[in-house]
Amino acid sequence: PEIAALAQILKISGWHKVLESFGPIPYTAAGKGAIDVPFDSEETVYTEMLKDLAGAVEVLTPKAVNNVKVMSDYDLVFNGDVTKWVKYANSLMLRLAIRLRSVKPELAKQYAKQAVEHSIGVMTEAGDAAGAGPGPVIALRNPLYWIADNYNDARVGTSILAYLMGYKDPRLSAYCEPANSQCTVAVTAFDNNKYQGVPLGHTNTRSKDTDPTDSYYFYSKPKIQGNTPLYWM
């Protein structure tokens, strides 16, 4: 049952994003093998998702209390740490309850309170963050790392660089790598590193050109390594 509970949380993690992006989806009748599957209203889906999350938390909580590991070799998110799964599920429950507050305020309040007042609670610190990364037997790598570092086909945009540099945002060095030392158009930022981004709509595709004045190959990369998790929350 605990593996099914994890699967339930994973399902809701993905489907609530689809719901928020596109509106009504097939949920209550999905997976039953029918050819014609009716779409549920957003209100119905949120209500059912909250119910399913509550059920998953109920199953996992005793395992968390007893420090039982679940699928630790194959869990790419929390390495089998059920306590963190419960925190994530409760945080997801709180998020969905907030989405529902204007339509079903009492039900939203009920689930929000249930999530926050749960004995294990919600995510409260950076170590609780949910993100898929390499596991003991699965060598998952961040796809953006391959695109930016191996294919040299992604660079930081000027929009975010202008914001981070303009406001002297301390997250600059956490988000962006300095430009290559050969880049002649890089700009010195407040942290004394030089950065350069690609303008929106830029059509220069010569990523491997050797001209440092006319190729984004030398521009700032997103600061991502192969083992950087793909964060969900």
Where are these regions (language model features)?
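Structured, solvent-exposed acidic/aromatic patches
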Residues: P1-M233
